[in-house]
Each structure stands twice: as structure tokens, then as C-alpha cells.
Amino acid sequence: MSNHPIPHKLKTFGPSKKLNDTGFLHIEGDQKIYPPFFDLNAIEQLRENWETQANDIFICTHQKVGTHLTKQFVSEILRAVYSYPENNPMASGDIGHATIPWPEVMVSQHGYAHFQDFLVKTADSPRVWYLHCENDDLPMKKIHPESKFIYVYRNPKGAAVSQYFFYKSHPLLEVNPAIEMDEFV
């Protein structure tokens, strides 16, 4: 269990291991490394079953390159153009996981039935997802040819500084909060 001063609320799936002496707790599967709050079975469910729709918009980023800012921009543009019904999470203007989900986390933390409910609630209007993976690792069975992808890039130096502060403060990664930038990089 983590000795980090800030607790986390995510379910974790093991066995987790540290990538090195300074932390970076992750799990391994399919010869890849995943965050410990991913359930590898959930990823497999998505890859076997999820077929995207024409109205799906994907924000594809590496962590700490502007994901939340991009989610905010896209949400505001869509809400200005479309009238979302009240039961659609996008109607709220919120950009959290319940509105603009990270599919692997949604299924890992809440189950595939919750994911399917989200698909039904949002089927008739543009819906937004965000992903932190490479194209070869997209968690879907089939991509609709009209689905849209927004790729966000950032200067690697700025991303490294942002990652440094994020990793130090994220309890689930078990990085020593006292780690220095030179050691981190």
C-alpha cells in the first residue's frame, strides 16, 4: 500500500510493480505497461466489442500535454453548436470522467454495463472521449470512418516539467514526493 500523504479512490488491479526505485507503479500485460487502475480484462472487452460511431470525437494526448484544456475547448464548441438533451452528460458543461470519459478507466472502474449505458445516453449527439495511448493500442474493435480524432502535442520540455509535478503528487504512482527534477528526468 502507498505511503503517499494523499489517498486515492481508484480501484487497482494487480500485481502492480515499481518500474524503478523512484516509483512509477504500473501493471504489465500484452508486453505493455498500463496504469495500475486499468483492468486488463476491461481493455480486452473494449477491443472485442466497441465499435465507434460517426458522432464519436477522440481527444488523443500523452499525459500532461493539455488534455483538460482541449476537453474544455471541445465541450464549449459542441455545446455552442448542438442542443444536448438534459439526460446527456454533455448538457452540463462538465468535462470530468462522467461526461468526457477515458474508456479504459470507465470500464475498469465501473464495468462494461456502465459503459454501455453511457453509449445509449449519448447515442444521438456528438460524444467526446479521451485517450492516452498509441494508435496501435486503441481500445476498440472497429473505428467508424467518420469518427474524428484530435491529436494534441506539446513541447517535450514543458510536458516533462508538468509530468514531474504530477507524478510527485499522484499517490497511486508511489513516486517519492521529495524526488528532485534531475533524478526524475
Where do the PLM segments sit?
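PAPS-dependent sulfotransferase catalytic domain
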Residues: 1-185
